[in-house]
Design a protein with these regions (language model features):
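Short nucleic-acid-contacting surface segments enriched for D/E, G, S/T with interspersed K/R
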Residues: 43-57
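Structural detector for short beta-strands of small beta-barrel domains
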Residues: 3-17
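Beta-strand/loop nucleic-acid-binding surfaces
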Residues: 31-46
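OB-fold/S1-family single-stranded nucleic acid-binding modules
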Residues: 61-78
Length: 78
């Protein structure tokens, strides 16, 4: 993880067949570029999937190409 900071966002899109998706989020009230995530970074039991407009919490890590990605993604309960 880049740092221990956690962020909240909303799933914009997730393709279970493709194995990745994007989260809409903001930092300090400023909208950021949608954050990429890989299904392996979803924290849950059973089948790892997310749905459009689900609220999530996540950290930020770096992928193998040195680009930021969401990690430790957890669905927020209502």
């Amino acid at each position: 993880m880049v740092d221990n900071e956690k962020f909240e966002g909303v799933v914009v899109w997730f393709g279970p067949k493709e194995g990745y998706g994007f989260i809409s989020w903001s930092k300090n009230g400023v909208q950021q570029k949608d954050m990429f995530f890989h299904y392996s970074d979803i924290v849950c039991e059973g089948f790892k999937t997310l749905f459009k407009e689900q609220k999530v919490s996540f950290g930020i890590g770096v992928n193998k190409h040195g680009k930021p990605k969401a990690i430790e993604i957890v669905v927020l309960k209502h």
